[in-house]
Amino acid sequence: MVSFFDIYTKASIVEAVRFSFLNTFQLKELGLPIKEIAVPLGTLVFLFVVIITLIPLLIIGNLIWTNLRLIERENTQQYQLVFGYSLIVSDIVGFAIVFFGAILGTNLKSVELFIALGWMMMLGSLIALGTTANLVSSIYLYIKLALKR
């Protein structure tokens, strides 16, 4: 029996990556039990989570950039609107991560789940970082306005 853990511990990283992209026919030719090999599924989950990670990061980065530009212009009303939107986006993405994690928890094996949850924890921490950056920028704005008065 070949498992995901065996492949990644016994093979080099390059071989493991190359092996993960083999199709089902090639796996049958190698004489390996396909149901026991989690690498193709793990690779798909990995790529899917990486793609999912990029979209919220772009959105949050854009919102932070917009907030910083609004701070420079001292447009507080529009800033608060964008800040509110950014918090809503962070909450929605955070909920989606939890929901996706629950789905993964019921469908994947333990090592795959560990990798996928690791990526989701990283994504969650980046979203928290984006929200924190928004909070810091709002505090900066209010201090700047208070000192100006």
Curated annotation (Swiss-Prot):
Q: What is the lineage of its organism?
A: Bacteria, Bacillati, Mycoplasmatota, Mycoplasmoidales, Mycoplasmoidaceae
Is Plastid set as a keyword in this record?
no
The protein's location, in the record's own words, is: Cell membrane
State the protein's name: Uncharacterized protein MPN_129
Ordered alphabetically, the record's keywords are:
Cell membrane, Membrane, Transmembrane, Transmembrane helix
**Family to which this protein belongs:** To M.pneumoniae MPN_090.
Q: What does the entry list under GO cellular component?
A: plasma membrane
TM spans, by residue? 39-61, 82-104, 119-141
Give the membrane topology, semicolon-separated if more than one.
Multi-pass membrane protein
